[in-house]
């Protein structure tokens, strides 16, 4: 009996999350897809390193750190662009995107410097 109530609770939770996410604006969903893509790319690189090896270790670290850093910056962009976030209400979306682009530029310059 406890399993069936736990299953019902889990199904209710997933249903409420799905219905809440359906109301999310499209621009936030696009940012979410970008974050998922960046994280999955990092995971693919880690699996590749585990299977094949990490001979140029600097290249492996640069690729993974680039993916993770880009995902973190995209999450920050999502927080700033979200209309329901009261902390960044005065920040225009164009400014948030410009910050995202500038921080990505700095991140990738550091990554390129790390490559040697």
Curated annotation (Swiss-Prot):
Major subcellular location class: endoplasmic reticulum
One GO cellular component, as annotated: oligosaccharyltransferase complex
Membrane protein topology class: Multi-pass membrane protein
One Pfam family it belongs to: DAD
Subcellular location(s) per record: Endoplasmic reticulum membrane
Gene Ontology terms describing biological process: protein N-linked glycosylation
Keywords: Apoptosis, Endoplasmic reticulum, Membrane, Transmembrane, Transmembrane helix
Domain of life assignment: Eukaryota
Lumenal side: 54-56
Bilayer-crossing regions: 33-53, 57-77, 96-116
Protein's pathway: Protein modification; protein glycosylation
Cytoplasmic side: 1-32, 78-95
Family (UniProt): Belongs to the DAD/OST2 family.
Subunit (UniProt): Component of the oligosaccharyltransferase (OST) complex.
Role according to the record: Subunit of the oligosaccharyl transferase (OST) complex that catalyzes the initial transfer of a defined glycan (Glc(3)Man(9)GlcNAc(2) in eukaryotes) from the lipid carrier dolichol-pyrophosphate to an asparagine residue within an Asn-X-Ser/Thr consensus motif in nascent polypeptide chains, the first step in protein N-glycosylation. N-glycosylation occurs cotranslationally and the complex associates with the Sec61 complex at the channel-forming translocon complex that mediates protein translocation across the endoplasmic reticulum (ER). All subunits are required for a maximal enzyme activity.
Protein known as: Dolichyl-diphosphooligosaccharide--protein glycosyltransferase subunit DAD1
Organism the protein comes from: Solanum lycopersicum
Source lineage: Eukaryota, Viridiplantae, Streptophyta, Embryophyta, Tracheophyta
